[in-house]
Amino acid sequence: MLAPTPLPIQVGPATVTMNHNDRFVVCQPDGRIVDTAAEGFFARDTRFVAGWELLVNGRRPVLLNSSPIQYFSSRFEFTNGKLTDDAGPLEPQSLSIRLDRTVWGGVHEDYTLANFGRRAVRLTIEIEINSDFADLFEVKSGEIVRRGAINSRWFRSRRELRTTYVNAAFRRELILQVDRADSPPQFANGKLVFIAKIEPKRAWRTCLRWLPITEGGRRPQTLPCHSIAAAPPEMSEVRLPLVRLEASNPTVVRAWDQAVRDLESLRLEDTTAARGVIIPAAGVPWFVTLFGRDSLVVSIQTMSGHPEFAVGALRRLARLQATEDDPERDMEPGKIPHEVRHGELAKLGILPFTPYYGTHDATSLFVIVLSHLFHWLGDVDVLRRYLPNVEAAMAWIDRWGDRDDDGLQEYKTRSSHGYYNQAWKDAGDAIQHADGTLAPLPLAVCELQGYAYDAKVRLADIYDRLDRPRDARRLRSQAARLFDQVNEQLWWEEEGTYYLGLDGSKKPIKSVASNAGHLLFSGIVPPERAGRVVARLMADDLWSGWGIRTLSSEHPGYNPFSYHTGTVWPHDNAIVAAGFHRYGFHAEAARIARATFDAAERFQANRLPELFAGLVREESTFPVQYLGANVPQAWAAGCVIQLVSMLAGIDARSDADGSRIYVDPALPDWLPELSIANLRAGRGQVSLRISNGNVETTSNTTGFEVVRGPAPALG
């Protein structure tokens, strides 16, 4: 008897998400918004709508189906169950009730109720919308404190309900406007009420707009009626051409296409001024704002053909780079910010997030991204433009990054509201000793050393391009000393990997974690040790089958559902895979890539979430969702681009002799051929076809030479 063929599996969060710019809606599959859940309509870190419900003759309609249509729109289809009007019972399933919802500036809703019964019906349609104006941080924690006053007023002539929130200098307002309706609206008992008389085979319609009023007091524009499937309006004057992928593996193509859509959907409008200036929000729902680390990681992930993310990140973060010392914001001169917030807690100074600087790695990553961008643009002017910023960043690395002047990078918050951990694993319990106890501050986490090393190597290369050989030699000397120190003090011989770091007493943190893979990515691992590190990271206690866990399953602090102590993060795995590839471990890198694409295939829309559970993979099953994961999320999307570029072996180098795109493919048997069109570099675009180890350039307007082979090492 033949074994049954497994059914296609697609899992995902039990909510519907729509987003555009810094506005988003998270709701139930039936469109409801539950005020006790982490749901609502949010704009600039404030929840403007905390509850929504539709009633027809006092009953909830019966959900038939719902689905996102575009990243900013969804449709909800209902019918009626048992329902009675003044003429008696209605036939079950005789009503079609449709809700279309779009997010763009505000929210636009189209309601259509069609009568397919044999008689006319009289319906009381009630739409309940309530607001709490809660700060996003408190919605996330579930500990909401109302500090200001809420007032609502119905303006009958304007057909709008205005709800205002005021707390000292912080003011927000929601305008609920009836845009058009086939019967006049009323406002009673906290609900919009319509009386609809619908003849057989006729329909009743209304449109509502939710208008959030933030700083400046202007009413935002929403999309017009019936726009759920429309091509999205442009946020910038010139639309960038899509970088297209064709491949023999359809799963990879679907994951790529969704990743590109996610990155497009996460663009922040206030930083998107023109062609080539794009910064993605970090993720929906919790990180719909500018994050230093996230925007820079996405820049690195997508550099092979998507340099506009790096252009936007450097431009915006350079403007926010610290120039003074403010302990409450963990701010020191030269430091790159962690995040910028606009909600009540930030605006009134309750949280120091305007912006907050409590991240260590973003400052090194800023230098690294500039180096990558130069090599992909071939424009020395970009180095001159940002040289003061990267020199200030390096000064921070040397003074503030190394707080005790021992040669290693460490962090310790100085803020009363600061983050305990300030590397990418920034959950409070992320860095534990072997017995599960928290490692005391300050912490010299291992990957920070790799980032600082890479930043020094790359700044030396920048100095070479600017004809400053003395400074280049100085940075290379510093990098060499850090290389030796890391490999002397952080190497863990018994485990064949690196310590997670050193704690505040310089005691090694003997916990096996994914962090060591970032050292391979940074190039700070001696070649003779690389094989042992790769083998340790691929051992069963770290390898789940869907990817490498953040922490060994043998560690007492391991929990497959914990944010940073046992889950699998796609972006973490892509960085580790790129490190494997850098040292020539192509099979192991491809294994991580295959597992990541297998996971994407099993998530809704082939969309990778921020993270998922570290449970062991079993045959014909699926990766388990992490409760509260951001979906879409920028560096989860970016990892798809990074993995494809890694397998294709694409990189760029620019020097005094010219600029070149190097292509050194190591395609696995599950991806024997691919074509990438419209990779952006230099002055134009390049399209490549890779098959059976052969590389064909099908078009090239970049001004770069395409070279078959690996890119030379820097320095």
Name the predicted role of every residue range.
Residues M1-S265, T272-S295, I300-V311, R315, ...:
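Terminal accessory carbohydrate-recognition/targeting modules of carbohydrate-active enzymes
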Residues E77-K82, E246-L290, R315-Y357, D402-A444, ...:
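Extended glycan-interaction surfaces of carbohydrate-active proteins
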Residues L370-R385, K456-R474, F580-A587:
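Inter-helical turn/loop segments and adjacent helix faces that build the functional surface
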